[in-house]
Curated annotation (Swiss-Prot):
Residues 86-108 are annotated as: Disordered. It comes from Chlamydia trachomatis serovar A (strain ATCC VR-571B / DSM 19440 / HAR-13). InterPro entries: Ribosomal_bL28/bL31-like_sf, Ribosomal_bL31, Ribosomal_bL31_B, Ribosomal_bL31_sf. This is Large ribosomal subunit protein bL31B. Keywords: Ribonucleoprotein, Ribosomal protein. One of its GO terms (cellular component) is ribosome.
């Protein structure tokens, strides 16, 4: 087997940036940042959503939006008025009554 082909597998500290929740998990994530957790120093990875903040796991319907995407959307489209529904127009036959085509018959 070739040496140095796979990244190093190690314990990494993951930090949920929206709740501050920290947990350790094995990973090949590469970083220079480290943080002390429970008396040991670990490489750290900051995540925006984890099981402590995701609505599926928390059971809440609260939307956590760190980047402000919802606010940006609301600001952009809040001034737009909905257009009134267009009234239906009556379509009249163009061909005179005697010149109308009969519907095509299906062949058996």
């Amino acid at each position: 087997m070739k040496k140095n082909t796979h990244p190093e597998y190690r314990q990494v500290l993951f930090v949920d940036s929206s709740t501050g929740y920290k947990f350790i998990c094995g990973s090949t994530y590469q970083t220079d940042k480290t943080e002390v957790f429970e008396g040991q120093e670990y490489p750290v990875c900051y995540v925006s959503v984890s099981s402590s903040s995701h609505p599926f796991f928390t059971g809440s319907k609260k939307l956590v939006d760190a980047e402000g995407r919802v606010d940006k959307f609301l600001k952009r489209y809040s001034g737009i008025k909905q257009s009134a529904p267009k009234p239906e127009t009556v379509v009249e036959d163009v061909l005179p009554k005697g010149k109308r085509k009969s519907p095509a018959k299906k062949k058996k």
